[in-house]
């Protein structure tokens, strides 16, 4: 008996669900990553400039934190200044 390998993964339990992640450092990004692993479309909002502090936190490899590489997978990121009206308006239109 042979096993068949699926070339196309099956959709996750959260396929079709959009999540807006606004957290920083560990807890928020971890939750967003986990939801993305279950198929959610995760959009991370970061402040313009430095972005999430996790990008530069410990264990820098090739200019990027290993923590960031792990916690940012399965996501799309957008830089918006939510302190400004324009950033707030864009977040409602595009997300």
Model-derived segments and spans:
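N-terminal helix-loop segment corresponding to the beta1-alpha1 unit
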Residues: 1-93
């Amino acid at each position: 008996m042979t096993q068949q390998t699926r070339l196309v993964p099956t959709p996750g339990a959260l396929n079709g669900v959009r999540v807006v992640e606004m957290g920083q450092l560990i807890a928020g990004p971890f939750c967003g990553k986990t939801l993305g692993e279950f198929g959610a479309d995760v959009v991370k909002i970061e402040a313009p400039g430095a972005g999430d502090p996790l990008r530069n936190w410990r264990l820098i490899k090739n200019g990027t934190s290993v923590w960031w590489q792990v916690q940012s997978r399965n996501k799309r990121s957008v830089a918006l200044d939510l302190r400004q009206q324009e950033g707030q308006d864009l977040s409602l239109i595009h997300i």
